[in-house]
């Protein structure tokens, strides 16, 4: 047979180099997406010795979901609301700013926090952006996903996986919503 015959099967083996290029490409998406991910914690005047020793904090991951002109709105777990009166949000550049709770839903376990835009430094403003949210109705089993934030119980985690299910419905006292399941492992208290 002549070289390059159209009937020859195409070698679809994924080489180590191909795999590394895929991971590098995915990490470029991670670096951009991280600009919209924050850490929300209860403000404390006491030092958190446990967090300093272990790297594990009592913060939750959040997503910058909107800019209403006056403040940035951040969607996160409401678990940091318990017994707290003040909150802080740490942005991707490592700076922290005072936050307030705009809305809290104990049934779903989520809250919306806000940070005044006029408090942000120019450096922070240039380092962040409002997350681009997709359409969950278009998510399909087998689609690739990336989880960011407190995915494994510590801050600044990155995990890759696929959507394993789009059929699950979570029931709450006041309704239900669809849940997109992934094969990304988590840990107790993870909020990425």
What annotation goes with each model-predicted range?
Residues 28, 64, 100-102, 120-154:
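Active-site substrate-binding loop(s) of clan PA
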Residues 35-40, 62, 71-76, 99, ...:
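Terminal peptide-recognition signature
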Residues 18-28, 44-76, 96-98, 130-132, ...:
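A conserved glycine-rich beta-strand in the N-terminal activation segment of trypsin-fold
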Residues 117-131, 159-192:
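Active-site region of chymotrypsin-like
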Residues 40, 85-93, 143-150:
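Short conserved beta-strand and strand-loop elements enriched in small hydrophobics
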Residues 45, 57, 67-69, 82-83, ...:
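Short, conserved beta-turn/loop elements at beta-strand boundaries and strand-helix junctions
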Residues 1-49, 56, 86, 120-121:
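N-terminal targeting leaders that route proteins to membranes or the secretory/organellar pathways
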Residues 67-109, 117-118:
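Catalytic-histidine neighborhood of serine endopeptidases
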């Amino acid at each position: 047979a002549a070289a390059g015959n159209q009937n020859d099967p195409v070698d679809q083996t994924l080489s180590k180099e191909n795999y590394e290029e895929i991971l590098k490409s995915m990490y470029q998406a991670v670096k951009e997406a991280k600009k919209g991910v924050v850490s929300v914690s209860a403000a404390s005047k006491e030092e958190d010795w446990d967090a300093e020793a272990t790297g594990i904090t009592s913060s939750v991951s959040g997503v910058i979901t909107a800019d209403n002109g006056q403040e940035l709105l951040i969607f996160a777990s409401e678990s940091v609301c318990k017994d707290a009166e003040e909150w802080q949000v740490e942005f991707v550049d490592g700076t922290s700013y005072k936050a307030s709770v705009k809305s809290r839903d104990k049934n779903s376990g989520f809250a919306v926090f806000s940070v005044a835009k006029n408090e942000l430094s120019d450096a922070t403003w240039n380092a962040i952006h409002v997350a681009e949210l997709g359409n969950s109705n278009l998510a399909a089993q087998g689609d690739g996903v990336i989880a960011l934030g407190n995915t494994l119980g510590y801050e600044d985690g990155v995990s890759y996986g696929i959507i394993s299910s789009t059929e699950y419905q979570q029931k709450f006292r006041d309704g239900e919503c669809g849940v997109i399941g992934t094969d990304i492992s988590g840990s107790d208290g993870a909020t990425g």
